[in-house]
Amino acid sequence: PINIKNENNLPSISIKNSDIEFKDVSFKYLNTKDKAINKINLKIQGRSMTAFVGHSGAGKSTIINLLPRFYDPQNGKIFIDDQDIKNINLNSLRKNISLVSQDIILFDDTIRANIAYANDSATDKEVVKACEFAAADEFIKKLPNGYETMIGENGIRLSGGQKQRISIARAILKHSPIILLDEATSSLDAESEKIVQNAITNLTKDKTTLVIAHRLSTIHNADKIFVVKDGLIINSG
């Protein structure tokens, strides 16, 4: 992501329904010829799940990454509850959005510290509760030092499924009304996949959720589906 400056004098975002709208949004990465997304128009109803499907490089991740302003579009505007996100304090915007990605960033610290990073005022009890909802508590308790277990640089001592559950626990602890979910394509075994899916169901309940979907079960559960191809939305339903 490029360095978007936070303007401290801008107002905090006011979330009511967490409706999202993209109006004529186009974006091109530096040193690339083609636009990653081109004149995207979409409306997402608050507290619903919207799935984006399409081949790799179609523009799905770009759409997701524009919402917390990891990048700003060259054209068009993005609104949350009718507020242009460029006119909102950046810290306030990002506090209201949780990203659960396959590229989770973990620190060489304890499991507890890695989860509490999402909400520095959270109590130990709240951390444990978030882990229970994320189906992470069970495996954490089996570790040599439980929540005080050091996980190594970027969580090297954890499996893919365990990392994902840590990421989900973090998002649950953050209590944000908007969830961005980039489903892991890495193959989890059937049991881990079921556990992760249940954790995601707990996380996304009553939240506005945008998901880059790779699993049929997610697509079935979505309230709306957008098909993305070559930076365009070619179908929805």
Residue positions per predicted region:
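Pre-NBD coupling/linker segments of ABC/ABC-like ATPases
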Residues: I2-I15
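ABC-type nucleotide-binding domain
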Residues: I13-G237
